[in-house]
Amino acid sequence: MASSGVRSVGKNLMKLKFTDKGIIDYRDCLNEMLSLIKTSPEGHEIWYLEHPSVFTVGISEKEIKEDPNSDPPIYKTDRGGKITYHGIGQIVFYFMLNLKQTPFKPSELTKKILASTSVAIEDLGLKNNISESDPGLYVNGEKLASIGMRIKSNYSYHGLSLNHDVNLK
C-alpha cells in the first residue's frame, strides 16, 4: 500500500511517496531499489518493510564473506557500515531520495536521518543517544537502530533498521 504527498521546503516542492512493502526478501528489495534509482525519479520514496532473517554486510566489514546458503543467508552489499541482522519484528526504512531536491548536503544525509529518528523515538518517551563510532541509536547501551546508506548518481538508497520486536538472540 502506498501513500504520497507533496511537501514544501522553502521554495522547493518535494514529491514524497511512502510505500509499505510488507515482508520482502532482501535481494528482491535491493533489486527494486536499484531499478528505481536507475529511472532517476524526480521525487523521493521511502519504503518501510520487514525482511525474512538475513545478514547484510556493508563495505566497512572486510572479514565476513558472503554465504547465501547459510541459515540465515549472508549477503555482501554496497551500503556503508558493517554487518546488520534483519528479521521479522524489525522495521526497515529505505530512503530513495533525489539529493538534488533536498535542502541539505548529501554528506549530511545519515546524520539527518538519525537525528530525525532520534527525535521521533524520544517523542514516544524513549530516551536514546546517537553513536558516532558505530552509527545508530542506542537505548541503555543497547542498539535500537542501525543505519547504512549509499549514494549513486545523486540518489540515496539503503536505510535504517529499527528493532521493534525482533529476536536478536
Q: Which residues does each PLM region occupy?
A:
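N-terminal lobe of the biotin/lipoate ligase/transferase fold
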Residues: 6-144
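Short, conserved beta-strand/beta-arch hydrophobic-aromatic motifs that form part
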Residues: 59-66, 73, 144-164, 168-169
